[in-house]
Design a protein with these regions (language model features):
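Cofactor-pocket helix-loop regions in the catalytic cores of large enzyme subunits
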Residues: 2-28, 117-413, 438-622, 630, ...
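Long, low-complexity segments enriched in small/aliphatic residues
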Residues: 583-678
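Short Cys/His-rich Zn2+-coordinating modules
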Residues: 36-46
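Glycine-rich loop/turn
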Residues: 108, 112-127, 341, 660-688
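Short, solvent-exposed secondary-structure boundary/capping segments
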Residues: 730-743
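Short cysteine-rich clusters marking metal-coordination/redox-active sites
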Residues: 56-62
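Long, low-complexity intrinsically disordered regions
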Residues: 753-778
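Low-complexity, highly charged intrinsically disordered N-terminal segments
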Residues: 82-131, 141
């Protein structure tokens, strides 16, 4: 069956709670399905065996690190989906765009759009016909250069980056944009782990995690906060279950009961598969209120302080690591005072947990000599995410759990090189040392004022302060909040440019003029003037390794991201401050520039020859604190007085529910591989909302009924999505969950994290209204 037919075929929607483990036969059947429907099955089987292997390519999925152990299979179910999605033979070429107008494509689902295949030639939008038509590469570059050079101010252009971009592409991009004259780098990290970078930079002096892959083998306790690895980082399940087997505590903190955090059946263990066995992936599971994590962590710290005082009074062993505190930290007394000022009653109320649960979590933490704290979007997409992550750091500092084997901080990143892009300088608020290095090496005046993040870029386009948008990968229109306003912002631009592998909605939410520039993916062989090229990526553990494509590109018109960026830069700036076209003839020349300007990349070209790549190092992981005081900082933040934003409270409307957005299992970011969500029991549908059955009844509905969801915010904008099916689910009362990007229209552009500007997609106040169509599926 072709992918085109597969996308047109929609199974009958149904809902049946899933009772099996994560992984197992379900994962194998899913992988087989995506192989067989890729239109390239035989080649893709061989290609998959090169995933995350030396001499192969880096998985285009998540940023989880590679096991140092060798093996033929180093990919997961969702990695297989990502590879088969990219490595299809199906093409979206000039004939496709001749058949479909942009208006007709807008009526299709995101799933249908992406399953049409790979973009194979550069296209320009023709407003008269409402269609894209072919354009020569040089003409496309000239059009971009004309718009950029005609802007009154370089800050009127926005340069977006997806975490798919390689280190080489990201470095070239930031160099071009800064030579052009702006720091406007709205980046996908602004919408996910921005709070982690901000919080950790202030607390421990580095905006990355401090652990390595090997640390998981030595941890006595692993906490997993606001994360669903079974879907988003499936290869993480193996170290979690191995930790449980060796007697470590694995403590999961998530309002939803996620199957990957309960049990895992390893698809590579034949005996386990044949016996249909599985192993637990946790020793405790706590389910706080949405946004209640900081209160839970503060409660754990309050128990530690109580036990420390009891130990001192009884002349017993200390609970705190006083040697570490004295030698490495600042602000502990102020933090302990903040703990004393926080009442147990307020902690229990805001966390949504009984005091006994908080005490148990604290005892599990205190019992572990070496503790790792992991977290993801459930922590980072709240208004108070920066203080919450600093509370994680505070808790770890009390017992010296940073900078020793088996212990540390682990923000688990999403896209495969989102961390590397930031290392390369994709940052709207770049550090001075990096700008100094660029000026010294390239001899041009680097812009010093902060640029725009994602939310600021949308506001600038809405208000006419930005007129050109260039997207290096991703699906900006669908990944962002307040979707109708984002679409309006893009349509306000004089020019939008999308550098993409596959068709998505961002090509349809376009400016007055628009370009689609088809680029290579991670699986494609990249041959430039000096021969075959490798690119590099950085994972969540600061490991950098090479990636070599394995498949011949579908069209000679497709180009690599570095080649496209060099073409744009050459047309816009000429050979200033570098010869762009000479650089991309051999990517080792780009890596030499990286080595000249970014710490820890000395001898870059030699280091990537090492099997498995090389470790960048981590100052905080070595107990070197890059803070003004050269110490790690306790942050005595107060808990939010109210989790509900004043703009919601000011309406006088009492929310029916607080909703979080999330992915399905057949999804990676905005890429929809299918319409099923196996672990949650959903088949053939995405317009659903998971709600506690008691809440469904309390609100006057019945399970399976369709509703409209209306967001509450203190402005005159109606934010509504229609026809969502209510599914009864094991979720705490008062909470709800639904898939993005479908519910992104409900997230106000103004509702962002303090200090991070990340949209608060995990805390959306909503009302439910009856939908005109009352058909039920259960």
């Amino acid at each position: 069956m072709s992918m085109h037919k597969e996308a047109d075929k929609v199974s009958t929607p149904r809902y049946k709670p899933y009772k099996g483990p994560a992984g197992g036969w379900g994962a194998l059947i899913s992988v087989a399905h995506f192989w067989l429907t890729s239109d390239n099955a035989l080649k893709n089987i061989r290609t998959m065996l090169k995933t995350n292997q030396n001499g192969g390519f880096d998985c285009p999925g998540c940023a989880w690190g590679d096991s140092p152990e060798s093996g033929m299979v180093k990919f997961c179910e969702n990695g297989a989906k990502a590879v088969n999605w990219e490595a299809t033979k199906r093409r979206v070429d000039a004939s496709f765009f001749a058949r479909y107008s942009v208006s007709s494509l807008l009526e299709q689902s995101d799933y249908w759009l992406e399953y049409q295949g790979r973009l194979t030639e550069p296209m320009v939008y023709d407003a008269q016909t409402d269609r894209y038509k072919p354009i020569a590469w040089d003409d496309a570059f000239a059009l971009i250069a004309k718009h950029l050079n005609n802007l009154p101010n370089p800050n009127m252009a926005e340069f977006y980056t997806s975490g798919r971009a390689s280190n080489e592409a990201a470095y070239l991009y930031q160099l071009f944009v800064r030579a052009y004259g702006t720091n406007n780098f709205p980046d996908c990290s602004n919408m996910c782990h921005e709070a982690s970078g901000v919080a950790l930079s202030q607390s421990v002096g580095v905006g990355k995690g401090t652990v390595t892959f090997e640390d998981f083998e030595h941890a006595d306790a692993i906490f997993v906060l606001g994360q669903n690895p079974g879907t988003n980082h499936p290869r993480m399940l193996e170290p979690l279950r191995e930790a449980v087997k060796r007697g470590a505590q694995v403590v999961c903190v998530n309002p939803l009961k996620e199957r990957g955090l309960e049990r895992f059946q390893h698809p590579q263990h034949p005996l386990e598969m044949l016996s249909n066995g599985s192993e637990p992936t946790n020793t405790a599971y706590f389910r706080p209120a949405l946004g209640g994590d900081m209160a839970m962590l503060r409660g754990m710290a309050k128990f530690l302080l109580q036990w420390e005082r009891e130990a001192q009074a009884n002349n017993e062993a200390s609970v705190f690591d006083h040697t570490f505190l004295n030698e490495h930290t600042n602000g502990v007394l102020e933090y302990l005072a903040a703990i004393d000022d926080t009442s147990w009653e307020f902690i229990v109320e805001q966390s949504g947990l009984p005091l006994s649960d908080i005490e148990l979590a604290a005892r599990m933490y205190a019992k572990g000599k070496n503790v790792i704290m992991c977290w993801a979007m459930g922590i980072t997409q709240h208004r108070h995410s920066v203080p919450t992550i600093q509370e994680v750091s505070n808790l770890m500092l009390l017992r010296g759990n940073i900078g020793r084997p088996g212990a540390g901080l682990c923000p688990v990143r999403g896209h495969s090189n989102v961390q590397g892009d930031r290392t390369m300088g994709i940052n709207e608020r770049p550090p001075a040392f990096f700008l100094d290095a660029l000026e010294k090496r390239f001899q041009f005046k680097v812009p010093r004022e902060n640029g725009h993040n994602v939310v600021e870029a949308i506001h600038a386009m809405l208000e006419g302060r930005a007129k050109v948008f260039i997207g290096l990968g991703g699906n900006f229109a669908q990944a962002t909040p307040d979707s109708p306003r984002t679409f309006e912002a893009l349509s306000n631009c004089d020019l939008t440019v999308q550098i993409s592998t596959k068709l998505n909605r961002s090509h349809l939410a376009h400016g007055k003029e628009a370009l689609i520039l088809p680029c290579f993916g991670r699986t494609d062989i990249d041959i430039q003037a000096e021969g075959p090229q490798a690119v590099t990526v950085e994972d969540s553990f600061s490991m950098v390794h090479a990636s070599n494509g394995q498949l011949k590109p579908l069209s000679p018109q497709m180009r690599s991201e570095p080649s496209i960026l060099a073409g744009i830069a050459n047309a816009t700036l000429g050979k200033q401050p570098v010869d762009w076209l000479w650089l991309v003839a051999d990517y080792s020349r780009i890596r030499d520039l990286i080595a000249d300007t970014i710490p820890s990349f000395q001898n870059f070209n030699e280091k990537i020859k090492n099997p498995g790549g090389f470790y960048l190092g981590n100052a905080a992981g070595s107990r070197r604190w890059n803070t003004p005081s050269a110490r790690a900082n306790f942050k005595a933040n107060i808990l939010p007085s109210d989790l509900v934003h004043e703009s919601i409270r000011g309406t006088g409307i009492v929310p029916d529910l607080i909703m979080q957005s999330m992915r399905s299992h057949d999804q990676y970011n905005t890429t929809i591989y299918g319409l099923d969500d196996r672990y949650r029991g959903v088949k053939g549908q995405r317009d659903v909302m998971f709600v506690n059955e008691a809440d469904i009844i309390r609100l006057g509905f019945v399970p399976g009924q369709k509703v409209d969801i209306v967001s509450i915010w203190g402005d005159a904008i109606e934010r509504r999505v229609k026809g969502f099916t209510l599914l009864p689910f094991d979720i705490p009362a008062g909470q709800a969950a639904a898939y993005y990007p479908e519910v992104n229209p409900l997230v106000p552009l103004e509702s962002v994290g303090d200090g991070s500007s990340t949209p608060t997609s995990k805390f959306v106040a909503i009302k439910l209204e009856r939908h005109a169509e009352t058909a039920r599926i259960i």
